[in-house]
Amino acid sequence: MSSFFLANDCVYFGKDGKDNAAGIDISGDKGTNATKAMVSMVSNPNFVNDAGGVGIAGLRDGSVAAYFSGSWDYKNVKEILGDNFGAVQLPKVKIGGTDKQLKAFAGSKAVAVNPNCKYQQIAVALAKYLGGKEAQQSHYDLRSVIPCNTELLAVEPVKSDVLVTAQNNTFNNTAVIQPTVTGMNDYWTPAQNFSKSIVNGEITLDNAAEKTEEFYKLINTSIVK
């Protein structure tokens, strides 16, 4: 859902995503039109809500042609589609009559060391190994976890891996860094409920402006304290 708001110039926690007091700006036409685009998508007979594994099941029986997910579902999707597997960055959608680029939230993991641990040198050495080239290669080989090591990204088989290309293109072209401010913790549950209201048909083209404004006030009341 956030991908639609981000696509239509809505702003999460200021321009750099670090201003908790700024809250989430989905006000006015930009938010309403994003909501209307989601309502239109849900009303399309080709749309399937991926609840309870329906999307994966649909890929398996052929009733679903394309699946919107992430690299965490690679193993299951690859098993089903085999040589027909493909992956790309986020698509564009019509919002307010204009093609807009969907944008995902992007993030990363880090390996940290407790500064108060007893054996600092050993802990640092372990952290360097776990975040290093060899460990990233093992993660890729065993679990298809995409490496960030530039040397690994430049050689086969990583270089030509469709999944790697899709994720990196998404990160570089169709994503924004997910804010790490505390307000994000108060966003997810209301956002999930808003999404469910769209899927359930409670939010329509006729009441999109009203419902988006209610959602806007709700999330910012809890976030901006």
Where are each of the predicted segments found?
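Extracytoplasmic/periplasmic solute-binding protein
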Residues: 1-23, 64
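Glycine-centered hinge/linker elements that transmit conformational signals in sensory
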Residues: 19-49
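Short amphipathic alpha-helical coupling segments at ligand-binding clamshell hinges
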Residues: 30-37, 118-130, 138, 187-190, ...
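Short helix-initiation/N-cap motifs at beta->coil->alpha
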Residues: 48-61, 72
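C-terminal capping/gating helix-and-loop segments adjacent to ligand/active sites or protein-protein/ligand interfaces
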Residues: 49, 145-146, 164-218
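Paired acidic/hydrophobic, glycine-rich loop segments that form the ligand-binding mouth/hinge
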Residues: 65-70, 86-88
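Pocket-flanking alpha-helical
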Residues: 73-80, 116, 217-220
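Extracytoplasmic/periplasmic substrate-recognition and gating elements
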Residues: 79-142
